[in-house]
From Swiss-Prot:
Cell compartments where the protein resides: Secreted
Protein known as: Catechol O-methyltransferase B
Position of the signal peptide: 1-29
Homology family: Belongs to the class I-like SAM-binding methyltransferase superfamily. Cation-dependent O-methyltransferase family.
Catalytic activity: a catechol + S-adenosyl-L-methionine = a guaiacol + S-adenosyl-L-homocysteine + H(+)
Tissue specificity remark: Strongly expressed in eye, diencephalon, spinal cord, hindbrain, liver, kidney and telencephalon. Also detected at very low levels in muscle, spleen, anterior gut and heart. In eye, expressed strongly in retina. In brain, expressed in the central part of the telencephalon, the periventricular gray zone of the optic tectum, the periglomerular nucleus, the olfactory bulb, and the region adjacent to the diencephalic ventricle in the hypothalamus. Expressed in gill, with strongest expression in gill filaments nearest the gill arch, and in esophageal epithelium.
Function: Catalyzes the O-methylation, and thereby the inactivation, of catecholamine neurotransmitters and catechol hormones.
EC numbers: 2.1.1.6
Protein's gene: comtb
């Protein structure tokens, strides 16, 4: 009887491992909503409970173990490897990250605003490409994420270009000119709460933070999606927009970036 029970437990354990490691991840690869539910809710909560740590903490540990201090590219590579082979995380990711890189390199901005820091992955991607003297202000609402992001930014050695600010975007955007001495931004990367994309864009317009030629680059416009934002920038005479088709980070589900040039 004991042998039967042990065999049953072993078989059940193997089945659960196969489901967790291969079958379910493979099944949700092409469906963005299911991928987010599986990776960003079910798996994250389970691992948080089992390890008594958070996903950002586990990501930071991987950076410190596998990335070279002071080497931004090695930090990016370490995070990408962690997210593809160990634990998914909602960074912009390697595929869309290349699109972000191309926009930053083409624009060569001196003043950049990032809305939504998370663990600092896109912050590092952007900052490593900025010219000398350039400035990147990144806003993060979640203080726990900000603690991790500061350490990732420091490990990458880009503190001289980055200023991380904790708080809500709607509170900080009106204070940008007075608090940071910023007149306008050359590039704004939107990757925070999706229902904030449109109101924050209108708030930046109203506060005079956008000049003719300012580029707004918005992530996750398909998955989870920002239909109200897309309708606005694609139909407004104040913007010229184009869509870069790609995939939700570290999956094969469709997602993309929307690049919108402010026309004044």
């Amino acid at each position: 009887m004991l042998g039967v029970l042990l065999c049953w437990c072993l078989g059940a354990s193997v089945l659960l491992y196969v489901l967790y490691s291969w079958l379910i991840p493979a099944a949700v690869q092409f469906n963005g909503s299911l991928a987010l539910l599986w990776h960003d809710v079910i798996v994250e909560r389970a691992l948080d409970s089992l390890t008594r740590s958070t996903r950002p903490q586990r990501l930071l540990k991987a950076v410190k173990q596998h990335a070279t201090r002071g080497d931004p590219q090695s930090v990016i590579s370490a995070i990408d490897h962690f997210c593809r082979h160990r634990e998914w995380a909602m960074n912009v990711g390697d595929e869309k990250g290349c699109i972000l890189d191309s926009v930053v390199s083409e624009l060569n901005p001196e003043k950049v605003l990032e809305l939504g820091t998370y663990c600092g992955y896109s912050t590092v991607r952007i900052a490593r490409l900025l010219p000398p003297g350039a400035r990147l202000i990144t806003l993060e609402f979640n203080p726990d994420y900000a603690v991790i992001a500061r350490q990732v930014i420091a490990w990458a050695g880009i503190e001289d270009k980055v200023q991380l600010v904790e708080g809500a975007s709607e509170d900080w955007i009106p204070r940008m000119k007075e608090h940071f001495g910023i007149e306008t931004f050359d590039l704004v990367f939107l990757d925070h709460w999706k229902d904030h994309y449109l109101p924050d864009t209108k708030l930046m317009e109203g506060c005079g933070l956008l000049r003719k030629g300012t580029v707004l680059l918005a992530d996750n416009v398909i998955c989870p999606g920002v239909p109200d934002y897309l309708e606005y920038v694609r139909n407004s005479r104040s913007y010229k927009s184009c869509y870069f088709k790609s995939h939700l980070e570290y999956t094969r589900a469709e997602d993309g970036l929307e690049k919108s040039v402010f026309l004044g």
